[in-house]
C-alpha cells in the first residue's frame, strides 16, 4: 500500500494540479497571506515568527489548563529526549507574547503591532474546514489597553476579508468582562447548572468546576438541549462598570468608522487568557463551524507567562477556511501563473543557446526553456500547457543573426527581435 499523508493534513500543490481545491494550492496560500500582509503592514504591523514547537508549559499556562486545546488537542513531541516537554503549537498568541517578553520587545515604541503566518496543530477530529495541521494568520498588538486599539484590530480583520473580495461575513461582537466579572458569572452558572448535573455531558460536568462559561460553547447535543430549555442570562449582564464602558467605546468607534457588527452576548472564547472585548468573524457556507476566525483582548496573559503586566489584543483566522469561503462565493483566486517567456530551440545544437537566452531573460521576467529540441508546433503546445505568454524560437537562422522569433500565445502577435532587446520587446 502506498504511503499517504496523515489524516487531517493537506499537501500544498502547484497550480494546475488535478483534483485540487483552492486551500490545497500553494499559490492560493501565498496570495491570501500577501493580501493580509499588505493590509496589516500599511497599518504599521511588523512580521514576527516563532518556533513551530514550544515548551508544553507555555501552552498550559498561556492557553489554560481547562481548555479543550490543552486537555484533548495538543500534539506532544517526543523526539528531543525529554519525553513530552515540547508540543507543536496549537495557536500563535502565547508564542508571540513569550517572544515579546524574552527578547525585550517592550523597549520598542508602544503599542507594538505584530503579525505572523504559519502552521498550527490540533489533535482533533478532522472535517471540512477543520484540520489537524492548518495555516493561520495572526495579528497582535501589545502595550495598550485603549478601546481604540480594540476597534482598530476588528476593523483590520474586516479590511483583510474585504480586500480578498469576500462578502456575506458578519462580525459577532461581545465582551467577557474582567476576571472579577467572570467570577460572578461563573458563580451564577454553577448555581444554574448544578441542579441539572445529570443532564450535562461528561466534559461539561468537568467544566462546571473548572470554567462553567465553557459549557455555553459546548457542541454536545445534551448540553445544547439543556441550554435551550434554561433561560441563561448573558455575560453582558455581569460586566463591571469599567468593562461595560470600554465595550460601549469599542462599539462607538466601529459605528463611527462604518464597520458592520452585530452584538452577540453568547460569544465565549475558547482560550482562558481572553478578557473584555471578544469577537468572531462568521461566514455561513463553509461547513463544520461557520467561524472564519476570531479575536479578543488578553491583558493578563503576560503575567501568566512570568512577565510584567502587558496589555494585548489580537486575532487570527484560518487560511484554509477563508479559501473555502472564497470558493463558495465564486471569487477567483489567482494561481502562480506560467512563465512570461518560454524559449525552445529548433535543433539540438542550439539548445544551450536557448537556455542561455532564458537565463538572461530571468533578470526581468519569469522565463523557462525546453531541455531538448522541438518542432514549432510542439513548442507552442508545451508552452500553452505551462501557461506561457510568449514563445521564443531559436533555429540556425536566429542563432546566426542573434535574434529570437517571438509569438504571443494570447494575442497571436509575432515578431523577430534581437536577443539584446528581448526585455523591451516583452515589456
Swiss-Prot record:
Keywords: Aminoacyl-tRNA synthetase, ATP-binding, Cytoplasm, Ligase, Nucleotide-binding, Protein biosynthesis. One of its GO terms (biological process) is histidyl-tRNA aminoacylation. InterPro entries: aa-tRNA-synth_II, aa-tRNA-synth_II/BPL/LPL, Anticodon-bd, Anticodon-bd_dom_sf, His-tRNA-ligase, HisRS-like_core, HisRS/HisZ, HisRS_anticodon. Pfam families: HGTP_anticodon, tRNA-synt_His. Homodimer. PANTHER family: HISTIDINE--TRNA LIGASE, MITOCHONDRIAL-RELATED (PTHR43707:SF1), HISTIDYL-TRNA SYNTHETASE (PTHR43707). This is Histidine--tRNA ligase. It comes from Deinococcus radiodurans (strain ATCC 13939 / DSM 20539 / JCM 16871 / CCUG 27074 / LMG 4051 / NBRC 15346 / NCIMB 9279 / VKM B-1422 / R1). The lineage of its organism: Bacteria, Thermotogati, Deinococcota, Deinococci, Deinococcales.
